[in-house]
C-alpha cells in the first residue's frame, strides 16, 4: 500500500519518522510554526526541543525503546579491556588530576 504524498510532495513514512507537513501530523506542525521555524527544524522525539535549523521539512525522530547507555562499537577497543563503567560511584580514578585547593573569597580581597 503506497503512502499518500505530504504537502511538500514528499512521502510520509510514519513507521520511522513523522513528517510534520503531513495532514495527519498537522497539530505538531502548527506547534513548530509557533516556534518560528516553519518547515526548517529537527524536533527531538525524546525532549521535544528543536535541535537544529535546516532547509528540509520538519521531522520528529522516533523515541528509542531502550534508554540504557550502550557504548558505540569500537569504544571498548579504544579503552582497552576496561569497561566504560569500571569504577563504582564515588571512587576517583588514579589517573585523574587532583582538584585545586578551595580559595576563600576574603583571601582574594573581595567583599561579599
From Swiss-Prot:
Primary localization: host cell
Keyword presence, Oxidoreductase: no
GO cellular component: host cell endoplasmic reticulum membrane; host cell plasma membrane; host cytoskeleton; membrane; virion component
Phylogenetic placement of the source organism: Viruses, Riboviria, Orthornavirae, Kitrinoviricota, Alsuviricetes
Motif (PTAP/PSAP motif): 94-97
Record organism: Hepatitis E virus genotype 4 (isolate Human/China/T1) (HEV-4)
Protein name, entry field: Protein ORF3
Residue numbers spanned by region Homodimerization, and interaction with host AMBP/bikunin: 70-112
UniProt topology in membrane: Lipid-anchor
InterPro entries: HEV_Orf2
Keywords: Host cell membrane, Host cytoplasm, Host cytoskeleton, Host endoplasmic reticulum, Host membrane, Host-virus interaction, Lipoprotein, Membrane, Virion
Region (Interaction with host SRC, HCK, FYN, PIK3R3 and GRB2): 93-102
Family: Belongs to the hepevirus ORF3 protein family.
Domains (record comment): The PSAP motif is necessary for the release of membrane-wrapped virions from infected cells.
Annotated stretches, region: Interaction with host HPX: 28-66
Record bears the keyword Membrane: yes
Domain of life, per lineage: Viruses
Region (Hydrophobic): 7-23, 40-60
Disulfide bonds: none
